[in-house]
Amino acid sequence: MKVIKYYIFLALMLLGFMPLSAQVYNDLSEQIADAAKQQVAQFTDCLSFIVDKGQKPENRNEFREDALKLFIGQGKTYYDNVLDKEGNVIDKRPHDPVTMEVTSLRNPKPRKKSVAEYLLNLVNLANQKTYRSVSIMSTQWHDMKVSQVRKIAEDQYVCDVYFEQIFESRGLENKLIYTDKTTKRVTVFIKILHTDYGDEFVILLGDIQATETKKNV
């Protein structure tokens, strides 16, 4: 998997666009889509490691911290720039921490939690001794679906990545306690950095929505 550098980038609404030919734009969109899917896959890998009963508690917390680094604001309040008509920064605009929608078969209506809280709940769940195993299995990155890549500013893009997530928990006698399958949509922000060594993608995840939850059969 290609290593992706993580940075927090702000001012997503900068003005100015550079025209691209259709072929160049299509090629760039494919690269962005693949990079976005791989970023989401890194997040889902962290989820599976967090709930793995074979992991030490301190390792679960490390995976939680790694997962938070994939998001805008790293799970905390983040800011973007407010510009005047000349493009000068005149203020900072705060945004609430990114959220994850959670659902269940009993409560299918999505409920929002901060990503930081969601991940902490997974750590606590995996640390409970009442479960023999807890697992989260997600779509492989190459099978994830991506919406149309949209340009929002110069060298800045956004898209939505769709994946399925299967949750399963088993009791001490290995009896299945609960399982479901949820389709999720995550907003992904991409910025292109032009460096002396070539172009780099800076990728950060935004809010995650649960679009459908059903029985895992």
Label for each model-derived stretch:
Residues S135-V217:
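Exposed beta-sheet edge and beta->alpha loop/turn motif
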Residues A22-E65:
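Short, low-complexity N-terminal intrinsically disordered segments enriched in polar/charged residues
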Residues D45-D52, I72-N81, I166-R170:
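Short regulatory "switch" loops immediately downstream of catalytic or recognition motifs
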Residues R60-M137:
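Short solvent-exposed beta->alpha transition segments
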Residues K5-Y6, V24, E117, Q156, ...:
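Intrinsically disordered, low-complexity N-terminal regions enriched in serine/proline/glycine
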Residues I8-A11, Q39, L47, Q74:
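Short, flexible helical or helix-coil boundary motifs
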Residues M1-E30:
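Bacterial Sec-dependent N-terminal signal peptides
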